[in-house]
Regions:
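Catalytic-core regions built around general acid/base machinery
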Residues: 62-74, 193-204
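Short, conserved loop/helix-junction motifs that constitute active-site signature segments
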Residues: 72-74, 162-163, 199-203, 280-282, ...
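Conserved beta-strand segments of alpha/beta enzyme cores
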Residues: 2, 77, 104, 122, ...
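Divalent metal-coordination and catalytic microenvironments
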Residues: 8, 28, 43, 48, ...
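N-terminal active-site segment of His-dependent metallophosphoesterases
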Residues: 1-67, 75, 169, 357-366, ...
């Protein structure tokens, strides 16, 4: 079995007001081209097909056309799950008959325990889930974090393992290294915050993950993030984007890079130097610019946009350093809950839910009481 592992398409996403739909259409052609050239048996999309739970009409049309092209025209089996940015009910509309065309779209926990069998491989499609959903499914209030939830889920999936097949998990969550020791009190494991241990995922021959946009977020030969296929923020400017080509027998994983349609560049310099060097820069790419000038420059953003039309952020070095110093000082004095919420937001791009906040406060209070 040979398949492509991709994730986090975020169709409909914008970059500081700039639509990325045209770039996403062009990038899709690269993905399709690789699938054809490598003669893959299937294409796996590990969640976050859309950027919003309520995508606009253009985003829906673009994704529908992409999936129809891969599945109906090119005849590739497609295996996909809903991510935290997707609306499972909306995404699952039509899923009952999609499978008759070898388009397997899983949006419910219950369906994750029925593997899709293609060739020598069983694919277990596990959509993004909340802790409470798993507690309710197993009627087990002792499930208090994501790793415990996954331990129950994996144990249930193993009941369906066919001994003569390879076993692939497709999922959308935060995975990290080995489990911490039981006496560690520095690790705050909050519902939805704690990572899934790689040890929990050991029964699978390969784990195709989505959620984190950097393929280097986890270094494991058989448990991998594909990362997003394109750069969606300035923080991803230096990341290489692409997807994994996976062979299950003999097992082999190969990284397939994708070329940015319009790249994101980080530029730093004086106004004069930026204007002088503009001719050497691609006009249609995106730019994050840090100005080193100390004096005031009237209408600087519009003047720079005459040379760099797609400026997504503009900073002044003197102010940027001041902001960094203030942020460091604030962080040093911040309460543990504030640090936790900031970390979660920076890591996942989402805010803590009311339930997560409540559990976080309770856990922190318990830790404080042990001191």
């Amino acid at each position: 079995m040979r398949f492509l592992h991709t994730a986090d398409w975020h169709i409909g996403k914008t970059l500081n007001g700039f639509s990325l739909l045209d770039d996403q259409r062009e990038l899709f052609k690269q993905i399709e081209g690789v699938a054809k050239a490598e003669q893959v048996d299937a294409i796996v999309i590990a969640g976050d097909l859309y950027d919003s739970s309520i995508p606009n009409e253009s985003a829906v049309r673009v994704l529908n056309n992409m999936l129809k092209q891969l599945n109906l025209t090119d005849k590739f089996p497609v295996l996909a799950i809903s991510g935290n940015h997707d609306s499972a009910p909306r995404l699952s509309t039509g899923a009952d008959w999609f499978s008759f065309q070898n388009f397997f779209l899983q949006t419910s926990l219950e369906g994750a325990f029925n593997p899709v069998v293609l060739g020598n491989t069983q694919f277990f499609l596990l959509p993004f889930f909340g802790i409470q959903t798993v507690r309710n499914y197993f009627n087990d209030p002792k499930i208090k974090n994501v790793d415990l939830a996954m331990q129950r889920i994996v144990a249930e999936m193993k009941k369906a393992f066919a001994p003569d097949k390879k076993h692939v998990l497709v999922a959308h969550f935060f995975a990290a290294g080995s489990k911490k020791t039981a006496d560690s009190e520095t690790l705050i494991e909050v519902g939805g915050l704690s990572p899934v241990s790689t040890e929990t995922l050991a029964p699978f021959d390969y784990v195709a993950l989505g959620h984190l946009h950097n393929k280097n977020a986890l270094h494991d030969g058989r448990i991998k993030y594909s990362g997003s296929p394109m750069k969606f923020s300035v923080s991803e400017a230096k990341q290489e984007k692409g997807m994994w080509l996976v062979d299950t027998e003999p097992f082999q994983v190969k990284w397939i890079p994708l070329k940015p349609v319009h790249d994101i560049h980080l530029l730093k310099g004086s106004f004069a130097d930026l204007v002088k060097d503009a001719a050497q820069q691609p006009t249609d790419d995106f730019y994050d610019i840090e100005l080193t000038d100390k004096g005031r420059i009237p209408d600087v953003l519009n003047r720079l946009r005459a040379y760099y039309p797609k400026i997504v952020a503009l900073h002044r070095t003197v102010f940027a350093q001041m902001i960094r110093n203030q942020a460091n000082a604030k962080r040093a004095q911040a309460a543990p809950l504030d640090l936790l919420t900031d970390f979660y937001s920076e890591t996942t791009g989402d805010q803590l839910s009311p339930t997560q906040l409540r559990v976080a406060k309770s856990t922190l209070s318990e830790i404080e009481g042990r001191k």
